[in-house]
UniProtKB/Swiss-Prot annotation:
Region described as 15 X 6 AA tandem repeats of Q-G-P-G-A-P: spans on this chain: 139-228
GO CC terms in record: cell surface; cytoplasm; plasma membrane; side of membrane
Region (Disordered): 72-281
Domain notes: The N-terminus is involved in the initial binding to heparan sulfate proteoglycans (HSPGs) on the surface of host hepatocytes. The N-terminus masks the TSP type-1 (TSR) domain which maintains the sporozoites in a migratory state, enabling them to complete their journey to the salivary gland in the mosquito vector and then to the host liver. The unmasking of the TSP type-1 (TSR) domain when the sporozoite interacts with the host hepatocyte also protects sporozoites from host antibodies.
Stretches with biased composition (Pro residues): 228-262
Covalent lipid sites (GPI-anchor amidated cysteine): C344
Residue ranges with Gly residues bias: 143-223
Source species of the chain: Plasmodium yoelii yoelii
Membrane-topology annotation of the record: Lipid-anchor; GPI-anchor
The entry's keywords: Cell membrane, Cytoplasm, Disulfide bond, Glycoprotein, GPI-anchor, Lipoprotein, Malaria, Membrane, Repeat, Signal, Sporozoite
Sequence segments annotated as region (8 X 4 AA approximate tandem repeats of Q-Q-P-P): 229-260
A Pfam short name: TSP_1
Full protein name: Circumsporozoite protein
Disulfide bridge map: C306-C339, C310-C344
Length: 367
């Protein structure tokens, strides 16, 4: 049994080492081949169209050959059919031939006059054609009657209705605000009550209702104590309603709405940038220079091997017209490029093979 196990292990190791297309390596190489091949839809479509065109040409050639073969086979049959036609001509009686040749043919000669009649027919046709063309031409110019329809655009008289917007004469009613002559009593603003009235001008925030600004006339009225009956009706209703409603509504709404969306957007952008930075690999200058020192003897103007056997790394080459020693090279004298080694299966194969050899040696020497 021991010998059998030794032989089996040895055979497996030999197969793995000598035949890389066997076992695990086979699947790995198949994946690599599939990844190396570029299946572009454009190329596939081109190949498909090329094959179809070739098949179409072959099919057309076959059809042509068949038709030619049928034609060649049909010609002798027609020749065979031709002599019976001659026989039919022979079967005709001589009397008929004589009847055909004499007076009838001579009578047919004068019908050359109908040939003369033929050209006039062509002339009639020629005359008819231009007449038809004239009729069509007449019908075409008749179409300009359609442009006569611009009378419809005459309807813009309807826009003449903007005379209705002339109704803004009604807003001319602001002549009532001309009543500020009453506030002309500012002689009394010496009273502190007058400065309180500037709250009323704050009301212009609602210019949508110009009637409101007319209200400041009311506060001016308290200065005219001569008419105490009118002010108590207007000011208590309008001024208390407008100033408390407008100032508290506007300032609290605007400041909280503007600053809040901004930090949110910035946070999202920061998160996205963080994710992108995590995905991308950017080597440092020290790593690049260390790799250059390692490959100083092999560094040329062609790309070097990747600095990593598995994962993402860097490959390097000299720039043209650079004659410095590798020790004195800087990042300005070197072209760098990021390389990725996604397939690390070879490492696992090496490990498995090494373990197999160790097991083989143990079985051979310690048993």
């Amino acid at each position: 049994m021991k010998k059998c196990t030794i032989l089996v292990v040895a055979s497996l190791l030999l197969v793995d080492s000598l035949l890389p297309g066997y076992g695990q390596n086979k699947s790995v190489q198949a994946q690599r081949n599939l990844n190396e091949l570029c299946y572009n839809e454009e190329n596939d479509n081109k190949l498909y169209h090329v094959l179809n065109s070739k098949n179409g040409k072959i099919y057309n050639r076959n059809i042509v050959n068949r038709l030619l073969g049928d034609a060649l086979n049909g010609k002798p049959e027609e020749k065979k059919d031709d002599p019976p036609k001659d026989g039919n001509k022979d079967d005709l009686p001589k009397e008929e031939k004589k009847d055909d040749l004499p007076k009838e043919e001579k009578k047919d000669d004068p019908p050359k006059d109908p040939k003369k009649d033929d050209p006039p027919k062509e002339a009639q046709n020629k005359l008819n054609q231009p007449v038809v063309a004239d009729e069509n031409v007449d019908q075409g110019p008749g179409a300009p009657q359609g442009p006569g329809a611009p009378q419809g655009p005459g309807a813009p008289q309807g826009p003449g209705a903007p005379q209705g917007p002339g109704a803004p004469q009604g807003p001319g009613a602001p002549q009532g605000p001309g009543a500020p002559q009453g506030p002309g009593a500012p002689q009394g603003p010496g009273a502190p009550q007058g400065p309180g009235a500037p709250q009323g001008p704050g009301a212009p925030q609602g210019p949508g209702a110009p009637q409101g600004p007319g209200a400041p006339q009311g506060p001016g009225a308290p200065q005219g104590p001569g008419a105490p009956q009118e002010p108590p009706q207007q000011p208590p209703q309008q001024p208390p309603q407008q100033p408390p409603q407008q100032p508290p509504q506007q300032p609290p709404q605007q400041p909280p709405q503007q600053p809040r969306p901004q930090p949110d957007g910035n946070n999202n952008n920061n998160n996205n940038n963080g994710n992108n930075n995590e995905d991308s690999y950017v080597p440092s200058a020290e790593q690049i220079l260390e790799f250059v020192k390692q490959i100083s003897s092999q560094l040329t103007e062609e790309w070097s091997q990747c600095s990593v056997t598995c994962g993402s790394g860097v490959r390097v080459r000299k720039r043209k017209n650079v004659n410095k020693q590798p020790e004195n090279l800087t990042l300005e004298d070197i072209d760098t490029e990021i390389c990725k080694m996604d397939k690390c299966s070879s490492i696992f194969n090496i490990v498995s093979n090494s373990l197999g050899f160790v097991i083989l040696l143990v079985l051979v020497f310690f048993n």
